Amino acid sequence: MTEDAREWMTWGDLGVAVEELAAQIESEGFRPDAVLALARGGLPAGGALAYALGVKNMATLNVEFYTGVDERLDEPLLLPPVPDLSLLRTERLLVVDDVADTGRTLALARDFCAEHVGDVRTAVLYEKPQSVVRCDFVWRRTDRWINFPWSTPAAVAAE
């Protein structure tokens, strides 16, 4: 994949995206009681959105699907530890990820949460046209591969 076939997000873009997503969420009247960030890509946006929305209750859900650029497992997998969402049965939960590409990771997380939580909404920085999930809150739509500032540098530790 050529560099010009990619979309590049900067840390500054993340700040703008979070402000705009928070404004969307507020304007819809959705007041989440908790934010669930999908690890690992959703952690920066999830944490920043929790701050922007004044939400102190946060959790993470580890989902493995992508193994490289355009490389993925057959199915997304929930990885331990899986949060106990039973205390949120009547609460409002915002599930946050960086991108809904195929949407299968977000669908797995949303469906898992819907079994335990009263009202589940989804927010992403980017949504792609082929996503099987139509997110409730989206900053940008694109069909390009996205380079995020937290995942673009090469890993320090050898795998």
Regions found by a protein language model. Give the residues of each.
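PRPP-associated nucleotide enzymes
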Residues: 1-159
